[in-house]
C-alpha cells in the first residue's frame, strides 16, 4: 500500500464531518471515499454500498470474527459501525482514501497506519450549536438524541489526540482549512 494516502475525518455526530467529506471529494476528484459498514437502518436518502455497507448484526459479527474490519465499535446494542479492511487497502492502491469515522475508530486507524494516516477532528463551534444541528436533522427520538449528546464530551476530549482540529463554525472556511491540511499531508 502506498505511503501517506489515508485521510480520516472524525467528529461528534452533527459537527459536519460528512458534509465536509462530500465537499473534499468534490474538490479532490482523485480522492476515493471509504464506505463504512453499519448495522443501523438506512435513512430514506441512503444507498447500500454508497453511503454505507448495511449489514445485519450477525453479518457484522461474522466480519469481526474473520478479521475483515480495520476498526469497529458497537455504539449501541447491536448497532455497529466499522471500516472494512478491504475498503481502505484496495482503494489506497489507486490513490488517496478518505474515511469518515468516529473518534475511537480514527485513533485506531492512526495506531495501525501511524504517519501514513492524517486524522482531522471536525469540532462544532459550541455544544449548543451541535445540539441544534442534531435536533434539526429530525432523525432521532429524544432518547437517542440524548445518547448522542452524552457521547459528545468523551469525543471532544479526544480531539487533541488527532493530528489537527478544524472548527466548523462556517462551512466554507472549514472546508478550505480541511483541503489545505490534506494537500499539505499528501505532498509531504
Curated annotation (Swiss-Prot):
Function of the protein: Essential for recycling GMP and indirectly, cGMP.
Gene Ontology CC annotations of this record: cytosol
The keyword Membrane is annotated on this UniProt entry: no
Classification lineage: Bacteria, Pseudomonadati, Rhodothermota, Rhodothermia, Rhodothermales
Official protein name in the record: Guanylate kinase
Residues reported to bind ATP: 11-18
Catalysed reactions, semicolon-separated: GMP + ATP = GDP + ADP
Family: Belongs to the guanylate kinase family.
Molecular function per GO: ATP binding; guanylate kinase activity
Protein origin, superkingdom: Bacteria
Organism: Salinibacter ruber (strain DSM 13855 / M31)
Domain Guanylate kinase-like: 4-183
InterPro entries: GK/Ca_channel_bsu, Guanylate_kin-like_dom, Guanylate_kinase, Guanylate_kinase_CS, P-loop_NTPase
Enzyme class: transferase
Enzyme Commission (EC) number: 2.7.4.8
Localization (cell): Cytoplasm
Keywords assigned by UniProt, alphabetized: ATP-binding, Cytoplasm, Kinase, Nucleotide-binding, Transferase
